[in-house]
Curated annotation (Swiss-Prot):
Binds 1 [4Fe-4S] cluster per subunit. The gene is nadA. Its EC number is 2.5.1.72. It catalyses: iminosuccinate + dihydroxyacetone phosphate = quinolinate + phosphate + 2 H2O + H(+). One of its GO terms (biological process) is 'de novo' NAD biosynthetic process from L-aspartate. Keywords: 4Fe-4S, Cytoplasm, Iron, Iron-sulfur, Metal-binding, Pyridine nucleotide biosynthesis, Transferase. This is Quinolinate synthase. Its main location: cytoplasm. Belongs to the quinolinate synthase family. Type 2 subfamily. Iminosuccinate binds at residues 27, 44, 115-117, 132, 201-203, 218. Pathway: Cofactor biosynthesis; NAD(+) biosynthesis; quinolinate from iminoaspartate: step 1/1.
Length: 314
């Protein structure tokens, strides 16, 4: 795309957003050009809170499908647009509603805590939703005598088991990017940059987390890199967050770890689903008023209860 085309697109996007009283929300894993034009950038919890309080008539969600669903569940009367409806999530896809219902029926006396990376139907059959930044706080509020079902991320679940000293029943889902980081590449990078701190998202498997100096959600990783006096960081999460890290820590250097050849994002750390959203698609969805998120009212109402529980307990 030519520079002039980008400038024109940005101007048109701003004009259309203002004309339709739309707010543009973007996740940290979006391309930098989308992050820069968004009205608000954040992690899943921050974006959920922003969606719950916005006065805009239209919410344009630059993220993946389940995130746009959350915005619609919280604001059923508002129009919620997603630039590309094919922007899915490997974690959400790993946990279909029918299988999850059967899973719950096998453990009727358990409290179901479900990661926000899940579809609306799964949220509807859950007790509480959590994000990576709120999960530990929520789990610690569950009585010790209650068994917890945690879905769908088994690596986040295993990390939380250690943090809270609570044994949970885990659904076997994973993120195709976080599970694919190469341990060999990480070790090589740590040798080459021996003063660098390793920052990791808890969706990474345990054999990678053991090397981390700090583990946290995208917002927590961003804050740590900003507050810490160290100037070199090796980052184990989707590389979109680096754009914001460089903004808040302009004097620091950030290194991206390659992924192995067995994952869904070969030799990179970009989520292929997140990157389906583009400036052109953002422009078109504002211009045309679609693709729009629509949900079954009953499912939406059921899912809202578990999301409200998250917002209250967070």
């Amino acid at each position: 795309m030519k520079e002039l085309d980008v400038i024109t697109l940005l101007q048109e996007i701003r004009h259309l957003a203002q004309e339709s009283n739309a707010v543009i929300l973007a996740h940290y894993y979006q391309d930098s050009e989308i992050q820069d034009i968004a009205d608000f950038i954040g992690d899943s919890l921050e974006l959920s809170r922003k969606a719950a309080t916005t006065t805009a008539d239209v919410i344009v969600f630059c993220g993946v499908y389940f995130m746009a669903e959350v915005a619609k569940i919280i604001n059923p009367a508002k129009k919620v647009l997603l630039p590309d409806l094919n922007a899915g999530c490997s974690l959400a896809d790993s946990c279909d509603a029918e299988s999850f219902k059967k899973f719950r029926e096998l453990h009727k006396d358990c409290v179901s805590i479900t990661y926000i990376n899940s579809l609306a139907e799964v949220k509807a059959y859950s007790d509480i939703i959590c994000t990576s930044s709120s999960a530990e706080k929520i789990i610690r509020q569950i009585p010790e005598e209650k068994q917890i079902l945690f879905a769908p991320d088994k690596f986040l679940g295993a990390f939380l088991e250690k943090k809270t000293n609570r044994k949970m029943i885990l659904w076997p889902g994973t993120c195709i990017v976080h599970e694919s980081f190469s341990e060999r590449e990480l070790i090589d990078m740590m040798v080459r940059h021996d003063k660098a701190y390793v920052l990791a998202h808890p969706e990474c498997p345990g054999h990678l987390l053991k090397y981390a100096h700090f583990i946290g959600s995208t917002t927590q990783l961003l804050k740590f890199s900003s507050d810490n006096p160290n100037s070199e960081f090796i980052v184990l999460t989707e590389e979109g967050i680096i754009h914001q890290m460089k903004k808040v820590s302009s004097g620091s250097t950030f290194y991206i770890v390659k992924t192995s050849d067995s994952g869904g994002c070969v030799s990179c750390s970009k989520c292929p689903h997140m990157r389906l959203n583009t400036l052109e698609k953002l422009y078109l969805c504002l211009k045309n008023g679609y693709p729009e998120i629509t949900l079954d009212p009953e499912i939406s109402s059921m899912a809202k209860r578990s999301l409200d529980a998250m917002l209250k307990m967070s």
